[in-house]
Amino acid sequence: MRIALGIEYDGSGYFGWQRQAEVDSVQGQLEQALSKVANEPISLFCAGRTDAGVHATGQVVHFETNAIRNEGAWTLGVNANLPDNIAVRWAKEVDDSFHARFSATARRYRYVIYNHNFRPGILRHGVSHYHGDIDADKMHVAAQALLGEQDFTSFRAVQCQSKTPFRNVHSVKVTRQGMYVIVDISANAFLHHMVRNIVGSLLEIGLGNQPLTWMADLLALKDRNQAAATAKPNGLYLVDVTYPEQYQLPKLALGPLFMLD
């Protein structure tokens, strides 16, 4: 049978999602815990491979198993075998047409900036600290240039392996909640480092170092070297993955937990 899981994790202690030899990964920890519950080797497929230090509240994975277990085994049972910074939020049996990556129609990320003169002691791994007076409204206006299907060469990592730089951004908004500035962006898919590169350039606009038209200018240039530095990983969360209604996957609060949803 095929099982889908909703996963939440604090990525600060891991070398990213993907299983790697000799370093700790989210995938490695999950596969180990699932294999114990299933009493057989389990291999996972995920909706989005997050980088080192990046978190998720809405990661979706699937796996094949011959084990017959109830929902509690795949949630509470697996959680009992996981470290405290990884948790299964839900489990659902799905048909064989479902694939965590290829069935997804959109991914949604939130980037959380703690905008204060002094660095935080609490939540330091869950937010990115930037001082200076950030104008979230200017960032929001500038970000609207990203909407639609476009060439995002200026915002892809040099080592990105995607065959095409084109992605379709469905929505993007920048808001402020007190000391937090949140960049919320949804697209059909994302290039390597695309969200963090976008945030890095939006910050330059929010800090008054670049004009409102800069995002549009960067898109036209198609040159990564012209954009700003990549934003830090610790403020980034994969918060949601969209699938066709036929799969009826659970929908929970997006998070992260300390934010207004």
Curated annotation (Swiss-Prot):
Binding-site residues, substrate: Y109
EC number: 5.4.99.12
Top class in the EC scheme: isomerase
Taxonomic superkingdom: Bacteria
InterPro entries named in the record: PsdUridine_synth_cat_dom_sf, PsdUridine_synth_TruA, PsdUridine_synth_TruA_a/b_dom, PsdUridine_synth_TruA_C, TruA/RsuA/RluB/E/F_N
A GO MF term: RNA binding
Chain segments annotated as transmembrane: none
Residues the record marks as active site: D51
Swiss-Prot/TrEMBL keywords: Isomerase, tRNA processing
Annotated catalysed reactions: uridine(38/39/40) in tRNA = pseudouridine(38/39/40) in tRNA
Function (record text): Formation of pseudouridine at positions 38, 39 and 40 in the anticodon stem and loop of transfer RNAs.
Family per similarity comment: Belongs to the tRNA pseudouridine synthase TruA family.
Quaternary structure note: Homodimer.
Name of protein: tRNA pseudouridine synthase A
Gene name linked to the record: truA
